[in-house]
């Protein structure tokens, strides 16, 4: 049993970044369970470069079905099946996304086999996570680990979720994944969690919270709460904005944070 929960940002980049890997985090819980949050197309390379082989993963949690969050799943599935001898890891998926993840995204490359057509659970141990359109829904995974999913607005008509990570009964981190600016969700996250990792686009308009919106929000909250916010999912021009984020900080790719 480890003393602390740890989070390493595997990638911090936006969907079109060429300097950073797709936004993704590797969480190591106190029982040793290693969870990858989202697996975009460049994330397997990011894991490799950080010294985390695919065989070190125990599970992957998916927050929504954009390619920069699921594009690396096919590689993981095929590697586990053909290189690691059919090893299955957990695939933790919000319940409304289980069917679209397979039917609309993954089956084109994973369905076919010499003997029969395959399904998602031929590659992963699929674990459905509870959701609620009215707020939060919690799923207990084992005696140590639980996840709370929060419905977010990212793209119209697309289901997307933020996730709260709980280890040994303690709220550890709120991870927004992708969402437009949502003052009420931020209020809740900063009240309930010691750390908040929030997506941040460096221009105004679009499908993510902008830096200007987040700066406007933090002007009205205590500095102690501002210090809890790490910004992620940013563009390649991020260096132009270093020192211009108030008390908030840009999450650094590859950096391990003790939660």
UniProtKB/Swiss-Prot annotation:
Residues 21-233 are annotated as: Beta-lactamase-like. Transmembrane segments: none annotated. InterPro entries: Anti-Pycsar_Apyc1, Metallo-B-lactamas, RibonucZ/Hydroxyglut_hydro. GO terms for molecular function: 3'-tRNA processing endoribonuclease activity; metal ion binding. Zn(2+) 1 binds at residues 68-69, 178, 233. It catalyses: 3',5'-cyclic CMP + H2O = CMP + H(+); 3',5'-cyclic UMP + H2O = UMP + H(+). Keywords: Host-virus interaction, Hydrolase, Inhibition of host innate immune response by virus, Metal-binding, Viral immunoevasion, Zinc. SMART domains: Lactamase_B. GO terms for biological process: symbiont-mediated suppression of host innate immune response. The keyword Flavoprotein does not apply. Pfam families: Anti-Pycsar_Apyc1 (PF23023). Coordinates 2 Zn(2+) ions. One protomer coordinates the metal ions and the opposing protomer provides the catalytic residues required for cCMP hydrolysis. Counteracts the host Pycsar antiviral defense system. Phosphodiesterase that enables metal-dependent hydrolysis of host cyclic nucleotide Pycsar defense signals such as cCMP and cUMP. Homodimer. This is Anti-Pycsar protein Apyc1.
